Amino acid sequence: MDDWSDYLVCLAVAEAGSLTAAANQLGVSQPTVTRRLQALEQRFGEPVFERDQGQSRLTPLGHKVIAHAKRMREEASAIERAVIAQDQSLSGLVVISASEGLGADWLPRALASFQRANPNIGIEIAIKNNTANLADREADIALRWNGPGTQQSLIGRRGATVGAGLYAAQSYIDERGAPQSVDDLADHACVGWSIGDFFGWPSSISGSAVVPRNISFKANSPASHLKGIEAGFGVGVTSHRLARASSGLVRLLPEFSTSLDLWVVAHETVRKSGRVRAAFDHIIAQMQADSAYFTRGEPSTL
């Protein structure tokens, strides 16, 4: 029988767009990926990819192969989910996906007591600022801002509401002054996101339109975004919990307040596992106990 994993290597190249990116994703060397693809193409008698300046594009045959390879991956993931679901023991590994802002700070502290109470359960935190694919077992549990979404196989519970407001460094205020109304923000430098508005941006006093922004600094991670505000690049919207933990930030225009709901999400089958269900419920309980921390930035209970 042909090696099924060759098809998954082919799928990784198609999704990553290059041999190098696929090798990094799979955790193997580029020559290994090349060798596996060559073996597959030799069996087929024609190429699966066209290679051009380091990029790999699917041939007509390649598109057909990838369609089947995706179904193979889905079925393999379904087998893994079924095996995990029937395991009710409180042992094994639980992989939790979270954004940088949560996974590097609050989540490890929240899980410490869980691991002490369940020493046979190992914890792995996967930092992802994009959405982990729970159906493909990229994680067992995910902390998400948008809930389970429209995928019916996912279940989620809202754990906390994360409040946010306008902040600037004292050094910026000393140099540029503080805005006296949301409309004044049009005359200030702003710290934004390169991945779209995370918490949103104030509308004008009339409410007819969003206040124009002069963005002086952009970032695609919460830590870098916060550092931009701290460094004095301008005014930015950040969560109260991050702002209160930072030195030298001043809240501006407290009448402007916004928030996002933070959800805990899992695949409905995987959540039946004893260890996953226990970790899921623990995270929810810790979020609820820390509601003032998330909503207003008050000291954490952890």
Label the predicted regions.
Residues S29, R36-A39, A110:
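Residues within the DNA-recognition helix of helix-turn-helix
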Residues Y7-L8, R43-F44, V65-D87, D290:
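Alpha-helical linker/hinge and terminal dimerization helices associated
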Residues S91-Q151, L302:
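Central regulatory/effector-binding core of bacterial HTH transcription factors
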Residues N24-Q25, Q42, H63:
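Alpha-helical residues within the helix-turn-helix
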Residues L134-D136, P148-L262, A289-L302:
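C-terminal regulatory
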Residues L40-E41, L249:
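Conserved amphipathic alpha-helical core elements
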Residues A12-G27:
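Short helix-boundary/capping micro-motifs
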Residues E41-L58:
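A short LG(V/I)-centered, amphipathic sequence patch enriched
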